[in-house]
Every structure is written in structure tokens, then in C-alpha cells.
Amino acid sequence: MSIQELSTEQEVEMITCVIDGFEVTVPKGTLVIRAAEKLGIQIPRFCDHPLLEPAGACRQCLVDIEINGRAFPKPQASCTIPVEKGMVVKTQLTSPVADKAQKGIMELLLINHPLDCAVCDKGGECPLQNQAMSNGRSESRFEGEKRLFEKPIAISSQVLLDRERCVLCARCTRFSEQIAGDPFITLNERGALQQVGIYEDEPFDSYYSGNTVQICPVGALTGTSYRFRARPFDLISTNSACEHCASGCAMRTDVRRGKTLRRLAGEDSEVNEEWNCDKGRWAFKYEVAKNRITKPLIRDENGQLQEASWPEALAAAAAGLKDAKVGVLVGGRATVEDAYGYSKFARVALSTNNIDFRARTHSREELDFLASTPTTATYKDIDKADHVVLINFEPEDESPIIFLRIYKQFKKRAIKVSSIASFTSRGTQKLKAKLIKTAAGGEVAAINSITGLSEKSVVLVGERAAETPGALSAVAKLINNSGAKLGWIPRRAGEVGALAAGAVPDLLPGNRPIDNASARVDIATVWGSDSLPTTTGMSTLEIINSDLQAVVVGGVDPMDISPDAKVKLAKKFIVSFEIRQSDITEIAQVVFPVATVVEKSGSFMDWQGKVRKFEAAVEQSLNRSDVRILSMLADEIGNQLICQL
């Protein structure tokens, strides 16, 4: 447990100790190594990690300790011993004994460690390299042969293991068991034969396996997508946000020569802590896919898409949209800025409220629910919850970081978890959730049967609840009667932001109703428009089934649109904003290439409603954001659209 977590507990007893001659006061239970960090004293370590339970495996953090004048007979691992009253600690900085012990441990760790630094992916950011320099001997006394293993072993399609590099810190095995709940990797054998491996009869199967690569301190675990690709000092790192779900993970994107080489979990104690899922870590190859669209496309007289100039494409799109009845499908991949641009483009440039971000299954009841029943839950509420209810929501599949937060509290406090679903999933099984088994369409009765909720309870609702008439109304009633906190969790990263931006048929930005005259005047004033359309617009399904002549499609995942819907859309004039070729571009008359999240700055809004900003990682990209192209298209139509570019 971190100092921050300890200090937030009520009536925490504070303990004062002395480290290297300096007094420090910390909450009771704080480990010596954390107390030293508070003073700015860095004790070398490999197995220690602030989010994992202490193991004392590597012994690199040995220090001299005495309590009330009585000294321990030998140096102790500072990562396993909590601070006590009257404790005096001497680290390697003030104790020759501790310094000698640390140098001895380092020498033992290096006996069988290979000299792979020249080719190891960890080189340049390796704790073993750094601490061998700062806390090791300047010369090696070892003259024997180092232990050799076959290298590397592919323990999954994404993770490789070099066993001879491993220092047996057990970070990876503790993460798999304590954080992910997937014991997919373990320590085999004992003593000098001990090594990391996977279970013989069980596959290396986890949504979170990439975190073991990031926390490995020595390069024993490496990712296949980054192996032998670059050195840390060759990379330009940019803080970013994950675009794959509504969890809102902080990320770090590493780019070399204008190309993303890897993505790492960023640190945000209030959201993803220091973890992310494998999709967020490795699903970035679409940026350089072979079917990436880099130039505008126009369908010619023979029905083939041909490359065109920007003026030609803008003119063709404007001609098809200007005098037509139009709908706008935004999709859940759009950033907040782009969704706001589509919302403004529909109302100002096209004079219509026919706009919807829900390419998936949806309903009018869902819109009423989202407008009247806002999300009140946060990650902190999950951390304090006594009961978490999952309604048509599988957190491990749909929002992996929410699952980790629930699992953390399940391990810590054995909180109660209930799930309204048709079967027990792998994730709910790990949470030992109570299954309220429900056939499709029976959710209303199941929701009405839930009792015993309180203000400390959290109800998490997935987007699939919109498929059952009355389900979301039952959820609203449950929340009002119990006082429980509510979280609406869509699958896509952009859906919460699209709702806030007014990319729906009956709401303006800020969840203000279309039929509210005052709201229309306020928004029109901000947008510099004389007036806004007053008629409630069409939903996605209504747009597809209508007699509208044209549809603007952007940020939509093609997999969300059914084959029947694509057939109906093919009969309309389609203007597509797309990253790469898809089923939508195959039926479009005009296609505009748009920038990916690494090529533009912007923000997403996570399920809590928290804005997650990110900067462009590839600054020299020639690709334009959706909102910039919308501004150009609005100018071509004849309605000026000024949005943040």
C-alpha cells in the first residue's frame, strides 16, 4: 500500500523514524523503502513495486536497522519491513555494512546474467544496468561459465522470455496473480534451478500480459512488436490517452522517425494506476496498415474510387450534400473535438438534427435515460463500494481497467459483486460474482428483483441494456429508490464525449434539449448562427431506414453496422471520413482520409465524464483531423464553420 493510500484512511496513526540521520513521519504500515523515498533517498531494488505486495525476493534493498537501540543481526530487506517507532535505518549511503551487502547481492545477480546489453531491448532504461553502475562492483570476479538457456521462448504471440536474463524478482508472477487474477506465469523448480515459465496444461492467456513486459526490470520479458526495433534514446515519447474503450487509460506513445513503435501504460493513480490491457498496448498497427487511406477518393463514372485532390473531393462532397436531406453518423471512435465538430456541422452547415453517435443497437429510451440519469459513479466509488452490480456489462471484455479496480477491492475486502447476464464469464468467475441468470429480454424482471443496495453500492450498466425495452427505465428506478451510484459504460472511447458534444438527435452540447428555446438561442449565439433547427432529428436506425438522400459517416466502426444496414446505406450519397479502407468506404461516393489519434491532439471523455487530453505524437503528419475537414467542407457548402483545429 502506498503512502498516499495509507494517509487517506481515517485516523491513521503516524510513525516517526530516522533514516540516514533524517527524521521522517509516515503513516503506520509504511515500508522502510517508501519512507526513504519520501526523504529523496533511493534504495536500489528489483522486486519491489508500489502496487504489488512485498516479496523480498531479490534482496537488493538491504539496509541496517535498529529499533530502540537494538540492532538487527544482519541487514534487512527494506521492501518488506514497515516503519516502527524508535527505528533507525542506515542505507548504503551511511552504512558500510549495507553498502557491502548490496554490492554482494549485485555480484551474485550478475553471475549468470548474460552480457546482452548491446542487443537487449531494456538497454538504456534498465534498472539492472543503472544499479550495477551505481551500487555494484567496478570489476567482476566471476571466471566460470554462465548458465545458458534456449532463447527466446515464445510464451505467447506477443511476449517472449529470455530465461538467463531473469533475476527471479517475481514481479511478473505477482502481477498475474494479484492484479490480473490470471496465474498465467509462474516460478518453476527451486533453488539454483528456479526459473520463470508458464503452466504446461494451461495457455498463456490474459488480457493484461503486456504489463509483465513493462514491469520486468531486466529485459527477461520482451514484446514481439518492439523487439530489436529501437533504443530508448532514439524514441520521442508523448503522453497520450487510449482510444480503444471508455476506461480512460493514461498512455505513453513512443515514436521513431514518424512511426509508432510501442505504447506503454501511463501513470494515473485515479484511473488506470500503472496498468493497461493488451489491446491498448499493442493495437496500434492500424496507423500504418496497407489499406491506410492517405488521399481523398471520389467514385468515378465506372463505380471505382479514384484518388483526387482536396479541392475536387470537397467540391464533390459539397455538391452531394448541399441541397439534399442529410443525416450524420458519428460513431464511437471520434474525439470530443471531432464529435463537437460533427454536431456543429449538422446543425449549422446542414441545418439538421439528424445526427447520432450510436452505430450499435440503440433506442429512444436510451436517449431519455442518458439525458435524465447522469453517471454519478467514479473509480473512487468502486474503491469504496460494498456491492457492485453489473447489468449487461462484462468489465473484463468491455472496460478492462474497471475490472482491475473491482478485482483489487475483491482481493482486498471481498466486496460483493452481482451480474445480470445469461452466463458466468471468465471475469465474473474471477470476481466470484453472484449470477442473476437472465435470458435475453428478461433483464427488467432481474433488475426489479435486486434489493439491499445502499449509497455505497455501485451499479454499472453496459450499452447492451439498450437492446431490452424497459431495462434502462428499470435501472433509473433502481438508482432513485436505492441511492446507489450509477455508471453507464459504453464500449467505445468516444461515446461519452459524443453525448456531451450533442452528437445525438434531440440534445445539444451540454445535454441541453433541442426543444428548449433558450438552449437553442445560447448555442446559436456561441456558434455564430442566426438559428438552429427545431425539429427532433433521426436516430442511426431511422437515418438508415429513411428516405434521406445523403449521409455523412465518420468515426464509425464498420463492424457495428449490420450487412442489411450497409445495403440500405449504399443507396444513399455517402461521404466517409475514414482512416483506412472498410465496408463503408466501399459504398461511399467521396472518402476523406483522417488523422489517427497519434497524428493529432485532442481528448476523449472517459465513463466518469473525466476529460483525457492527449497531444500529437507524430507532429509532422500531413493527415487532417475530422473537425478540420468539416470546416473546409462547410466553407465549400457556403456555411462558415469555425472549430478548434
Where are these regions (language model features)?
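Catalytic alpha/large subunits of respiratory electron-transfer oxidoreductases
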Residues: L110, P114, D162-E164, C169, ...
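Fe-S ferredoxin-like electron-transfer domains
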Residues: S2-T8, R59-E243, S247-M251, R256-R263
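A basic, amphipathic helix-loop patch mediating RNA/tRNA/ribosome contacts
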Residues: V32-E66
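Glycine/threonine-rich phosphate-binding loop and adjacent beta-strand/alpha-helix elements that clamp
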Residues: V598-V618
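Extracellular/periplasmic ligand-binding modules, especially the Venus flytrap/periplasmic-binding
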Residues: Q620-L645
